[in-house]
Amino acid sequence: MDKVALKRKLLDAVEARADDIIAAGDWIWCNPEAGFKEYKTADYTTGILRDLGLEVEENIGLTGVQAKINGRDDRPNIAVIGELDALLIPEHLESDPDTGAVHSCGHNGQMANMIGVAMALVDSGVMEHLDGSVTCMAVPAEEPIEIEWRRELYGEGKLFFLGGKQEFIKDGYFDDVDISLANHMATNTEWKIAVRGGEGPQPGGVGFMGKMISFKGAEAHSGAAPWNGVNALNAANIAMSAIDAQRDTFKDTDAVRVHYFITKGGDAVNIVPSEVRLEMMIRAASVEAIKDASMKVDRALRGGAIALGAEVEISNIPGYLPSQMQGSDALWRSMRDNAFEIFDEEDLVVGTADPSPIRTPHGAVSDINDVANIMPKASFGVGGATGVGHSRSYSIVDKYVAYVMPVKLYAGMVFDLLWDGAKLARQVTEEYEPQVTKSGYMAYWKDILEG
């Protein structure tokens, strides 16, 4: 069977599984779980992959799952990534009544996409004609939430990072992966699939580091003798004002964002607050900008403590690396070519390369950036949702677009990358220059945290 016929067989296998793929997306939507707690979703995914006859590895990064589909060679190995976790938005009408979890970022769609790829590759039998392998990865905890609880897991030695992909990297599960493919859902779009245009580097997402901050003062009676206390809340307020005063020093091109909230503001209104805790994220477009902002923030925090005679404890937490968008032009071309081959042109939008010298990345973060720093990665946008992402208004309104169409693009790319001795995949890996080596990843993060 020639290339065209085999590829058509693969795409037809996706269409034949459309109802099953949609059912998977619906099941995961109805069973949302926050990061590192996705036990039901992991079990559900494991069951489907095993029913396909695949050998499944479980409990990676606590709840992660992966299964490898072998072709004629073990390498190159392409990872198709789906994210297991949901957000916590109890105001959403379809959130879990007990936990408040809901898939208001569309990760249930990613999981349906990844499951669909496994179904189509196995059903079609095309891997017998392809020179490489595909690893279907279900990764936990993309959303950096419940940080205090995750720090408890760190203290227990169960985690080092906040993100599931980072745990996969740390534990070596990306060591035999050569290329990664991912996507993300958008809302209120006229298009159905969005692919990157242009050549060369383009701005992507920012990275971040986290901070857990504790101001320590001394309690006293708020009304009778407040002068006998040291007000930790006042120290925190001065520190936050000092951080705000630093914002003019952040370059626009660095896309710095410093945001925080108070997780403990005191114990009682008639007691001078003796301990105040904050949770903070520092986002920026480069590691250097993250370090610079972190230094300025720490200075402000210490200044607030000194002003009130309090003490402050600052714990730096590894976040996610900034995106490296230079990647591989051959990989981006493969994505565009497949999109136009498989879909109607009116269903697509192609991003254009930004010719301006000032190119500001968007402010969202994801641990897929860490993957993109160590290997070639391509992501595309998916429509089919409405409302505001990360909010109570989010919903999926076109399940075929959200759940099935991305499977076809993944399938087409995998086929082309591994066809004919995997020439295209090998070109992609030869073009790519890693920003961080897999073996040096942990040391790189430790250097960031130490400033």
What are these regions (language model features)?
Residues 2-104, 108-135, 140:
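Acidic/His- and Gly-rich active-site-bordering loop/insert found
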Residues 76-79, 133-135, 178-181, 347, ...:
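Structural motif
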Residues 2, 234-451:
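Metal-dependent amide/peptide-bond hydrolase catalytic core
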Residues 82-87, 186, 206-208, 263-266, ...:
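Short glycine-enriched loops at secondary-structure junctions
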Residues 79-81, 90, 211, 216, ...:
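Non-cysteine beta-strand/loop elements that form the S-adenosyl-L-methionine
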Residues 92-102, 108, 124-259, 267-271:
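Histidine/acidic-residue-rich, glycine-tolerant segments that coordinate divalent metal ions
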Residues 28, 67, 80, 107, ...:
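Divalent metal-coordination and catalytic microenvironments
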